[in-house]
């Protein structure tokens, strides 16, 4: 999220696409009410329709994206929980979005199911299903469509958020220190999920702070490449080069937020 904000601030175009409306996701208010005795429940929450909740979720997503300057937010809409075999047409819809926008970079859910003890997890999950549908749509967008004059489009690079991986699988970090407050603000937009200012701040402190600690900065976001890239020569980022010449005290000050 902060990474997208950084790119928008530098003139790049960012589009956020949500497969579903989030109708059956994180309805914490309904969950809270149903946990109460029947005579103590808030009837307005109990009677809330899926369409009403969907509108609330969409508004929250748009508000969170607006924090980072993202105005192109698209909600495709599909059956929930999303399963490709139930809504295969979604792949074509995603392909059409790709052909319209023609992005150079795709950041999507990880298609790899998290496992324990090296065991294979074959259960279906919204996140991995969206990842597989998106990657299939990306591949379809790069091939000609019979009966159409639309030029195929091949996305140059695909990345997955590091939150779905172990630290030794990260390919690079984006320093998000200057965007910490924006991340908290965006996180706090999801009121329907029970988020509060205190919870949002603590969550970002722990997640971006943990990534920042291991990357040598205060707050960071991590990414995993789908595949290795071909480069014209070996390059070193400005951050990496600068830090190779600094004393230990500077490193500690930066992690403490006293120096950037």
Question: Model regions: which residues?
Answer:
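Active-site rim/loop-helix segments in enzyme catalytic domains that contact anionic ligands
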Residues: 1-101, 254-257
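Metal-dependent de-N-acetylase/amidase catalytic core
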Residues: 72, 80-260
């Amino acid at each position: 999220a902060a990474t997208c904000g950084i790119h928008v601030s530098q003139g790049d175009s960012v589009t956020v696409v949500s497969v579903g409306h989030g109708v059956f996701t994180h309805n914490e208010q309904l969950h809270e009410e149903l946990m109460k005795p029947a005579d103590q429940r808030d009837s307005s929450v109990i009677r809330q329709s899926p369409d009403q909740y969907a509108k609330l979720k969409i508004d929250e997503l748009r508000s969170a994206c607006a924090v980072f300057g993202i105005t192109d937010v698209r909600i495709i809409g599909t059956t929930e929980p999303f399963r490709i075999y139930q809504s295969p047409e979604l792949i074509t819809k995603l392909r059409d979005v790709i052909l319209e926008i023609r992005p150079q970079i795709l950041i999507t859910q990880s298609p790899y199911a998290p496992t324990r003890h090296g065991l294979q997890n074959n259960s279906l999950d919204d996140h991995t299903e969206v990842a597989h549908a998106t990657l299939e749509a990306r591949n379809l967008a790069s091939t000609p469509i019979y009966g159409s004059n639309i030029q195929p489009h091949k996305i140059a690079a695909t990345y997955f958020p590091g939150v779905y991986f172990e630290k030794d699988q990260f390919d690079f970090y984006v320093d998000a220190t200057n965007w910490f407050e924006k991340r908290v603000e965006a996180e706090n937009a999801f009121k329907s999920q029970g988020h509060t200012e205190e919870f949002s701040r603590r969550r970002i402190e722990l997640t971006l702070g943990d990534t920042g600690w291991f990357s040598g900065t205060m707050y960071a976001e991590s990414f995993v490449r789908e595949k290795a890239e071909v480069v014209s020569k070996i390059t070193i980022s400005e951050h990496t080069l600068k830090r190779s010449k600094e004393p230990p005290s500077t490193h500690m000050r930066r992690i403490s937020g006293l120096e950037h």
